[in-house]
Swiss-Prot record:
Mn(2+) 1 binds at residues 401, 405, 461. Pathway: Carbohydrate degradation; glycolysis; pyruvate from D-glyceraldehyde 3-phosphate: step 3/5. Its cofactor is Mn(2+). Coiled coil: none annotated. This is 2,3-bisphosphoglycerate-independent phosphoglycerate mutase. CDD domains: iPGM. GO terms for cellular component: cytosol. Its EC number is 5.4.2.12. GO terms for biological process: glucose catabolic process; glycolytic process. The lineage of its organism: Bacteria, Pseudomonadati, Pseudomonadota, Gammaproteobacteria, Vibrionales. It comes from Vibrio parahaemolyticus serotype O3:K6 (strain RIMD 2210633). Catalyzes the interconversion of 2-phosphoglycerate and 3-phosphoglycerate.
Length: 510
């Protein structure tokens, strides 16, 4: 068997591009190798943050998201962005689980109950999603639309619910039907520590309108809670009904849509609506059509509007199906990223996949050893390139990220210089065997060590672009405007392999 000429992807973790050289450890370090590559080789910048990697607009990237996107060859949307995007695209209102539950309630002249954390916090839920659900129920002909508001005050300021409640009172006035039916703090409705007596307060409010307090409007109910010195999180069960209105309780045949997308604080209250529940004695147990926005737990037998997205034909899986060999190699700090996250959350190796782990140094903080284990990692990587065993090699160097996180500028420069030396040896080995190499990053970090706004030490990731450099014999010209999810299709193209249909990323080579 002839020796393989590998295609290697080297991910310099935390190695972003920033024009401003102030407090920029990457620009100011002595990097003769990277300077020569950028002067002489095909290169471009690609996006590694925000919507381009499935995060909210403007949000900095991170290693988990970055490697997931690189390995998937498509943008992998986080729940918040996935649902927000579905609303913008008009797909939300066609979601089968929601359509079925609402239509069944409308047909039987029953109520549609929508509940969730009423907040723009974006951690467990987003009120924009709840707004879309109310509009959808109204558009599909629901006459009784009852909104049950769990109040936040943890991911938002402690007393900030009034704007949200007013927004929904205005929406119901505009629709001419529906109303806010109840208020309760997340302390009760969203417990996650088996404090079932708290959850029971919320359950009894939803199913019996059993409440310590009542109010004619949601805003009036909130003002009364503030007068009792209860912040949003701790607002006691409050039933909302004006004179002459019936209790807005969950009854047989009603639809109930739970609009939280984060599972950990949604599970307990949801389990209270499932047969066989024993957390507390339920005075009533209505036969409702309950829809979870996302899957809160695999063992909860209820409909899910947005089931977990399983990633078929990630880069590693696809290479395996083509009978190709691949190596994943990094030091401890980023080993999970080039294996588990790169494989789309799959723990086990694919056939033909090998893994090598180099131990990260045992130091209190990495500014004390900015080169980390790059010499040992490079030695193993060069040996793998020259071994002729692998079609593809994926390697992550953690230095720019891990030393960037320490905030120690001089150490970050040293980390970048150690990386440069390592990259030089890798480039040499690739040229020697006639292979191909792509150098990139998963997100930025070390290019901004001082926060330009505050003047304080900047230890976080950035939302800046990252480099993409090609080394090899092919006449490559890169397109502009790429992103991390374009790397897998680009690599398959460079290797002369077919690209699976699931990979919606672009090939960045013209």
């Amino acid at each position: 068997m002839s020796a393989k000429k590998p295609l290697a992807l080297v991910i310099l973790d935390g190695y972003g591009y920033r024009e401003d050289t102030a407090s920029n450890a990457i620009a100011n370090a002595k990097t003769p190798v990277m300077d020569a590559l950028i002067a002489n080789n095909p290169h471009t910048l690609i996006s590694a943050s925000g919507m381009d990697v499935g995060l909210p607009d403007g949000q900095m990237g991170n290693s988990e998201v970055g490697h997931t996107n690189i390995g998937a060859g498509r943008v992998v949307y986080q729940d918040l962005t996935r649902i927000t995007k579905s609303i913008a695209d008009g797909e939300f209102e066609q979601t089968p689980a929601l359509v079925e539950a609402i239509d069944a309630a409308v047909k039987a002249e029953k109520a549609v109950h929508i509940m969730g954390l009423m907040s723009p916090g974006g951690v467990h839920s987003h009120e924009d999603h709840i707004y879309a659900a109310v509009e959808m129920a109204a558009a599909r002909g629901a006459e009784k639309i009852y909104l049950h508001c769990f109040l936040d005050g943890r991911d938002t300021p402690p007393r900030s619910a009034e704007n949200s409640l007013q927004r929904f009172q205005d929406l119901f006035a505009k629709l001419g039907k529906g109303r806010v039916a109840s208020l309760v703090g997340r302390y009760y409705a969203m417990d996650r520590d088996n404090n079932w007596e708290r959850v029971q307060v919320a359950y009894d409010l939803l199913t019996q309108a059993k409440a310590e307090f009542t109010a004619e409007t949601a805003v009036a109910g909130l003002e009364a809670a503030y007068a009792r010195d209860e912040n949003d999180e701790f607002v006691k069960a409050t039933a909302i009904k004006a004179e002459g209105q019936e209790d807005a309780i969950m009854q047989d045949g009603d639809a109930v849509i739970f609009m939280n997308y984060r599972a950990d604080r949604a599970r307990q209250i949801t389990r209270a609506f499932v047969p066989g529940f024993d957390g507390f004695e339920r005075a009533v147990f209505p036969a409702i059509n309950f829809v979870m926005l996302t899957q809160y737990a695999a063992d909860i037998p209820l409909a899910t509007a947005f089931p977990p997205a399983s990633l078929e034909n990630t880069y590693g899986e696809w290479l395996s199906k083509q009978g190709q060999t691949q190596l994943r190699i990094s030091e401890t700090e980023k080993y999970a990223h080039v294996t588990f996250f790169f494989n789309g959350g799959v723990e086990n190796e694919f056939e033909g996949e090998e893994r090598q782990l180099v131990a990260s140094p045992k130091v209190a903080t990495y500014d004390l050893q900015p080169e980390m284990s790059s010499p040992e990692l490079t030695e193993k990587l060069v040996a793998a390139i020259k071994s002729g065993k692998y079609d593809t090699i994926i390697c992550n160097y953690p230095n720019a990220d891990m030393v960037g996180h320490t905030g120690v500028y001089e150490a970050a420069e040293k980390a970048i210089e150690a990386l440069d030396e390592s990259v030089g040896k890798v480039v040499e080995a690739i040229k020697e065997v006639g292979g191909q190499l792509l150098i990139t990053a998963d997100h930025g970090n070390a290019e901004m060590m001082i926060d330009p706004e505050t003047g304080g030490v900047h230890t976080a990731h950035t939302n800046l672009p990252v480099p993409l450099i090609y080394v090899g014999d092919k006449a490559v010209e890169f397109k502009e405007g790429g992103k991390l999810s374009d790397l897998a299709p680009t690599m398959l193209s460079l290797a002369g392999l077919e690209i699976p249909a699931e990979m919606s990323g672009d090939v960045l080579v013209k």
